[in-house]
UniProtKB/Swiss-Prot annotation:
One of its GO terms (cellular component) is virion membrane. Residues 319-442, 464-499, 514-526 have a biased composition (Low complexity). This is Glycoprotein gp2. Keywords: Glycoprotein, Membrane, Signal, Transmembrane, Transmembrane helix, Virion, Virulence. Residues 1-25 form the signal peptide. Residues 24-185, 319-619 are annotated as: Disordered. It comes from Equine herpesvirus 1 (strain V592) (EHV-1). Its main location: virion. It comes from the Viruses. InterPro entries: Varicellovirus_Gp2_glycop (IPR010278).
Length: 866
């Protein structure tokens, strides 16, 4: 019975111990959550040091020494904190049964220092654990009642030492439990206090560390910021100066503006670099920050010196920069970076007079070269096209910026104007039939003249083969005549004996193209002209041109000239003369030249339209000269007319349109040479070029060749002159076009370049519309534009609803001398409309679908990873 009783008693104790143990475990788990980062110890003696700081209090609270070992093996994973006190309580294990209170007090005292000692060792984990423990501390206080299970430790020794005096322990357990309860309460209180202390320590440590880091960063930032602020202040000053400079420069030279921009960029770069360094310093350790701060301070000091000190102080900092800066103060704009590269002349280290500190700082930053502002200003103007501009020395005060910039620029402009006056312009004469329009086209005669208009007295020179003109070299370079005179260009164009002159259009059967694009025609046959007289087949052959006569061509060999023959046929009007055109030719021995008795006189050049465009040739023969007149209509902006007079006599050529004189638009006259039935014929060619806006088509134009002895003052009696008149044709050919409205409800027929109001006929499908089936509007002849007829037909959709698929439209316009038409097919308007509707609907639906898909993709929940 005793044995059975003992078994029951032991069983009850075991159950009680198990219950107590489970309670303790629960409490321990709560505690362990707070110290999860501290311990991984599984043996009491080994890992106590690592996790003791935080968990030593619970160890101390378990007054029975037995509990010390108990928590070591069993709650290793959950309550690593108990392990901390293990080392101290190890010897207590033996006396656990006897002196529970004493050992408890002792161990508590001993363990606590250990915990405090270990706490610093725990670097990052300690603060974190402490922070977490604080939260758990409350739980500990709450479970203080459960802490009664501190006796839990009692059950653990049994597991650790199965051979222990189990019976004795069991007997003693009851008193122990009672005592433990009392002590446990105290221990619980102690635990809370200890835990709080540990937590406080950890928090303090963390705060201290953070404060230190923050302090360092703050210090660095403050230092850096100071330097940056200083630099920024300097930069601002420099930038302000540049802005002022830019304002002055903008009105003077574009290059100066660019320079100002460059200066600003340089200043900004410096500021940015300083900022970048400061950022790096902040990120780097404290040591690096200190070093960087020093550098920043130095920079700031330098900048401050440059800004505050006068020009002399800046010179001390950088000799070259100071010199340039000081000088640049005179003309802050013209100096700058871009100008220095342009001109390196006249470098002089002129010390500037007292200059504004701001200007000095800016100049030093912008200019990095030694040349004085003098050369800089010169270069700025040179950029404006003044290769020969003279450098101007600037030796003055800041207010000199405007003066320095303005003076060189004026010189430059004058230089440009002077060079422009020596520029020679060359034009060429070309006459070619226009078979399509029934009129002939022409280009300008070859004439070299200068821009400067002047009134020069006509001079009389001997017209000889040797002195007739200036001989050009092989490079086709034009010889510039003296100012106010016009050089006479002599060239030759020959035709076969069968060539005739008259009011007829010459149909070219063989056309030769000169290298500059002009054409000369030979073997021509006359054809009646239905509308207007044509140019004569006489035309000027440029130096590099080709004629049908086998002669030596100046500037080109005959072989080279013949290479172009036969490859091009009748191009109406050709192209305007190339830059090589207009070279003056010299008669060759194999060309027929006029007799030495023949003389000619130059007329003054009047490109801008003067009223003295008179070409004078010696005395008029008793018979009247042959004169031909043609008008070119191929150019869109200008009407060109050419008048050719066969004569070796002195003549003056005048122009009239209607009753108004248009000599102001005379492009000048040239001498040319023709071959008529194998006999050389000399002719005078005058060209007129008038903007179409000043000309009303279908007006009469007259060319008059008057003897020079009849020219008296401004009045000329054209009745005593040989005249030729013709009608100015329309600027272009008659053409007709049909257009459909965007809605497909109207068809419009427009015919332009009409001489008179024509007759129009509309056909829709196989039906011919009556006159009341369409509307028409007539626009009369205006300057530069012939008549325009606009006709409109309404498109009726009702007929299409019954299956008609398309409609074809024909517009025929018949004028007095021409007929044009246009034919267009209009698709079914309903089909077009339906197609557009379907296309728009499809596009809209597609876009909506794409938007929906995108929305679904963005809002779809994503799977979480556990």
């Amino acid at each position: 019975m005793g044995f059975i009783y003992a078994r029951k008693l032991l069983l009850c104790m075991a159950v009680s111990i198990y219950a107590i143990g489970s309670t303790t475990t629960t409490e321990t788990t709560t505690s362990s959550s707070s110290t999860s980062g501290s311990g991984q110890s599984t043996s009491s003696g080994t890992t106590n040091s690592s996790s003791s700081p935080t968990t030593s209090p619970p160890t101390t609270s378990s007054s029975p020494p037995t509990s010390t070992h108990t928590s070591s093996p069993s709650s290793t994973s959950t309550q690593s904190s108990s392990t901390a006190a293990t080392s101290s309580s190890a010897p207590s294990t033996a006396s656990s049964t006897t002196s529970i209170p004493t050992s408890t007090s002792t161990e508590t005292t001993t363990t606590t220092p250990t915990a405090s000692t270990t706490t610093p060792t725990t670097t990052t984990a300690a603060p974190t654990t402490a922070a977490t423990t604080t939260a758990v501390t409350t739980a500990a206080s709450t479970s203080a009642e459960t802490t009664t299970a501190t006796a839990t430790a009692t059950s653990t020794p049994t597991t650790t030492t199965p051979t222990s005096t189990t019976t004795t322990t069991a007997t003693t357990t009851v008193p122990t439990t009672a005592s433990t309860t009392t002590d446990t309460t105290t221990a619980a209180t102690t635990t809370a206090a200890t835990t709080t202390a540990a937590t406080t320590t950890a928090a303090t440590t963390t705060a201290a560390t953070t404060t230190a880091a923050t302090t360092t960063a703050a210090t660095t930032t403050a230092a850096t910021t100071t330097a940056a602020t200083t630099t920024a202040a300097t930069t601002t000053a420099a930038t302000t100066s540049s802005a002022t400079t830019a304002a002055t420069t903008s009105s003077t030279t574009t290059a100066a503006t660019t320079t100002a921009a460059t200066t600003t960029a340089a200043t900004t770069t410096a500021a940015t670099t300083t900022a970048a360094t400061t950022t790096a310093a902040t990120t780097t350790a404290a040591t690096t920050t200190a070093a960087t701060t020093t550098a920043a301070t130095t920079t700031a000091a330098t900048t401050t010196a440059a800004t505050t000190t006068a020009a002399t102080t800046t010179a001390a900092t950088t000799t070259a920069a100071t010199t340039t800066a000081a000088t640049t103060t005179g003309s802050p704009t013209s100096g700058s970076t871009s100008t220095t590269g342009a001109s390196t002349s006249t470098p002089s280290a002129s010390t500037a007079t007292s200059a504004t500190p701001t200007s000095t700082s800016t100049s030093a930053a912008a200019t990095t070269s030694t040349p004085t502002p003098t050369s800089a200003a010169t270069s700025a103007e040179s950029t404006t096209e003044a290769p020969t501009s003279t450098p101007t020395t600037d030796t003055t005060t800041p207010s000199e910026a405007t003066t320095a910039t303005t003076s060189p620029e004026s010189t430059t402009v004058s230089a440009s104007t002077t060079s422009a006056t020596t520029t020679a312009f060359t034009t060429e004469s070309h006459t070619s039939p226009d078979s399509s329009t029934g009129s002939t086209s022409t280009a300008e005669p070859s004439s070299t003249f200068t821009l400067t208009p002047s009134t020069a007295t006509p001079s009389t020179d001997q017209f000889t083969g040797s002195s007739a003109s200036t001989e050009s070299d092989s490079t086709d370079s034009s010889t510039v005549p003296t100012t106010g005179t016009e050089s006479i260009t002599e060239s030759s164009s020959t035709t076969e004996a069968s060539t005739n002159l008259g009011s007829s259009t010459y149909e070219s059967t063989e056309a030769l193209e000169t290298p500059d694009g002009n054409t000369t025609s030979g073997n021509t046959t006359p054809s009646p002209s239905p509308r207007t007289p044509s140019f004569a087949d006489t035309q000027q052959t440029p130096d590099n041109g080709v004629s049908t006569q086998h002669t030596t061509i100046n500037d080109h060999t005959t072989a080279n000239a013949q290479k172009h023959a036969g490859h091009h046929r009748g191009r109406a009007g050709g192209r305007r003369g190339s830059p090589q055109g207009g070279s003056h030719t010299t008669p060759h021995p194999d060309r027929l030249t006029p007799s030495p008795d023949d003389t000619y006189d130059d007329d003054t050049n009047h490109p801008n339209g003067r009223n003295n465009s008179i070409e004078i040739v010696p005395q008029l023969p008793p018979d009247r000269p042959i004169i031909e007149l043609g008008v070119a209509t191929l150019r869109k902006n200008f009407m060109e007319a050419s008048c050719t007079v066969e004569t070796n006599s002195g003549l003056a050529i005048f122009w009239k349109i209607g009753n108004a004189s248009v000599d102001a638009f005379n492009r000048g006259t040239t001498h040319t040479r023709l071959m008529r039935n194998g006999v050389p014929v000399y002719a005078l060619v005058s060209t007129l070029r008038v903007p179409w806006l000043n000309v009303i088509p279908l007006t009469k134009i007259t060319c008059a060749a008057c003897p020079t002895n009849l020219v008296a003052g401004d009045g000329v009696d054209l009745n005593s002159c040989t005249t030729k008149s013709t009608t100015i044709p329309c600027p272009g050919q008659q053409r007709t076009h049909i257009f459909f409205s965007a809605k497909g409800d109207r068809a419009v027929c427009i015919t332009s370049e009409l001489v008179s109001q024509p007759t129009i006929t509309w056909s829709v499908g196989s039906d011919r519309l009556r006159n009341d089936g369409f509307s028409q509007t007539w626009y009369g002849i205006q300057p530069g534009v012939c008549g325009i007829l606009r006709s409109e037909v309404r498109i009726h959709r009702t007929t299409w609803r019954f299956g008609s698929t398309s409609k074809d439209y024909l517009c025929e316009v018949s004028a007095s001398d021409s007929k044009t038409s246009d034919y267009k097919v209009l698709p079914n308007a309903h089909s077009t409309s339906n197609f557009a509707l379907v296309a728009a609907t499809t596009l809209t639906v597609t876009i909506l679908c794409l938007l929906c898909c995108l929305y679904c993709m963005l809002t779809r929940p994503r799977a979480s990873v556990y």
